[in-house]
Amino acid sequence: TPSTEELGNLHRNVVFSGTDKLPAVPFSRLNSSNPEGLWRWMDGLRKQGIESLAIPHNSNGSNGAMFAFTDWAGNTIDQEYAEQRMRNEPLVEITQVKGTSDTHPLLSPNDEWANFEIYPKRVATALPSIAPGSYVRDAWQRGLATAANNNGNPYKFGVIGSSDTHTAAAPLEEDNYFGKVSIMDATPERRGSIPASFLYGTLIRLGMPDMVEEVDDKTYLNFPGYKFWGASGIAGVWAEENTREAIYDALRRKETFATSGTRIKVRFFAGYELDEADLTSQDLISTAYQSGVTMGGTLRVDADRRPTFLTWAVADPNTAQLQRVQIIKGWLQDGEHREQVYDVACSDGLSVDTNTHRCPDNGAKVNLDDCSRTANVGASELRTLWQDPDFVPGQEAFYYVRVLENPVCRWSTWDAIRSGEQPRPDLPATIQERAWSSPIWYSASTDDNNFVH
């Protein structure tokens, strides 16, 4: 679990494919703070028949270091670096309790849903973390840029979600949030969602004045980052069977998705023969596998043919219904990063506006007096076929799915209501739970930096 000299987070989790043969001791920051040292260690184990992969997490707190354009020594990333990183790190964590690392409003100003559970600090500090180089969508775009310069793509990874609670207990439900680690944030008062008592607030102010803040003439505890934490997240894996071997292989091939805590399921395929696919067929998924590539894969250019994308999202029956399915595209134009969010499926029989690429409002609301939600609004599942209206043949790009639920009360609002308080005005009262797929890359390149064990 290394960090930079500026306290930028560079934590990784290492997953082994099996348990029959394991290293005697793990690699840690006592060995090196350089992630490249970890990869060399993993490569060495692989030569001994010990297969593993590493998953970076909390990139949002890396202060731009997780997805830099340079290596540890400050040299420009090259093909060898890209191949080594992708060989060892095919996945990245996109959401967890310490914030979501999809994107940031500063990076995606035209994405209305970018400001979701943003954790603005470097991990375990009060220092700000810069956005460029810290968020996953930006990393995918950076990967296109390095590949365009013939230096390979070190950021062609899939996504998972995780909890990072260190307790084997994940606080995934907004209405049942119990914090990250109980000794720190087990009560609404400690995590800053309700005003501190006079006694507790006074004691903290006397001993740690920076750990108290005033909001609308009310005193709240301000322990580092607690108010920004989220009830997240979950890793989704499409494996042939529920075995360690099958799940590991799915992780390795990046057939994975993430959710912010609810149990949404999402499928994503792309191909040149999917435009006639029958969305009602019981053989839809087998047809998609035969006719295209799935999340985490690369669709090769086929002359000027326009690919068709298949998305299928299923709601968690115990939470809010689905509001919309989106496909997010990233590409380079004259060397500049470009992105576009397309709504591709709307709930309640609504249709996407072809000019704005947005679904109309489906009318889903939340009553902040008791957190009740508008009834009979939303969809239990959404599936569709879609083609990119701005498709340019041969233009390198990535596409990934984001699924949005109807709004619900955030955990901090539930805390306030149950304590007889008003929700904090400086925190979001509601959120939209969501899921993200791993991308599909559209590419003319024959070198995709994929390593399949």
Task: Indicate residue ranges for each PLM-predicted region.
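Hydrophobic or amphipathic alpha-helical targeting/insertion segments
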Residues: 1-15
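Structured catalytic-domain cores with a bias toward divalent-metal coordination
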Residues: 2-3, 27, 31-63
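C-terminal functional module detector
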Residues: 6-10, 22, 46-52, 58-73, ...
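Binuclear metal-dependent hydrolase catalytic cores centered on His/Asp/Glu-rich metal-binding motifs
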Residues: 11, 17-33, 37-39, 107
